[in-house]
């Protein structure tokens, strides 16, 4: 029975350190976060079969892991009239009517801005 007490105390001591690796809210305008958003949208456009490009409509959630450069983002994307390899997709008009698809995506991106290296750890998207 008493052998459980040191184990419990050890778990209590580790609790804050374990929780520190959870995602926490951050601002949507930070430079590293913005670069990760750009990378995630580029990756989405490159790996989806549609030849039209999607662009960012708004950021629904912006978070990062404490003490790391791993970012979690929920993005709302809209289908444009531009092709995915066109220049300046951000200024491209959205498609109207039944072709005007929108998707909600969640991306987890690990960044190494010093090396300009980004890695997509996970992504899920759902058409709305």
Curated annotation (Swiss-Prot):
InterPro entries: Cystatin_dom, Cystatin_sf, Cystatin_spermatogenesis. Residues 1-20 form the signal peptide. GO terms for molecular function: cysteine-type endopeptidase inhibitor activity. It comes from the Eukaryota. Glycans are attached at residue 104. Keywords: Disulfide bond, Glycoprotein, Protease inhibitor, Secreted, Signal, Thiol protease inhibitor. Its main location: secreted. The keyword Secreted applies. It is found in: Secreted. The keyword Signal applies. Disulfide bonds join 82-92, 105-125. GO terms for cellular component: extracellular region. Belongs to the cystatin family. This is Probable cystatin-15. It comes from Bos taurus. The lineage of its organism: Eukaryota, Metazoa, Chordata, Craniata, Vertebrata.
């Amino acid at each position: 029975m008493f052998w459980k007490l040191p184990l419990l105390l050890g778990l209590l001591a580790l609790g804050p350190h374990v929780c520190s690796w959870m995602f926490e809210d951050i601002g949507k305008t930070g430079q590293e976060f913005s670069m990760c958003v750009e990378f995630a949208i580029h990756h989405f456009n490159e790996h989806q079969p549609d030849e039209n490009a999607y662009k960012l409509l708004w950021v629904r959630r912006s978070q990062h892991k404490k003490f790391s450069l791993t970012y979690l983002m929920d993005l709302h994307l809209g289908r444009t009239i531009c092709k995915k390899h066109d220049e300046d997709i951000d200024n491209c008009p959205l498609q109207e009517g039944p072709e005007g698809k929108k998707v909600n995506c969640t991306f987890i991106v690990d960044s190494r801005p010093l090396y300009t290296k980004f890695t997509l750890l996970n992504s899920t998207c759902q058409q709305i």
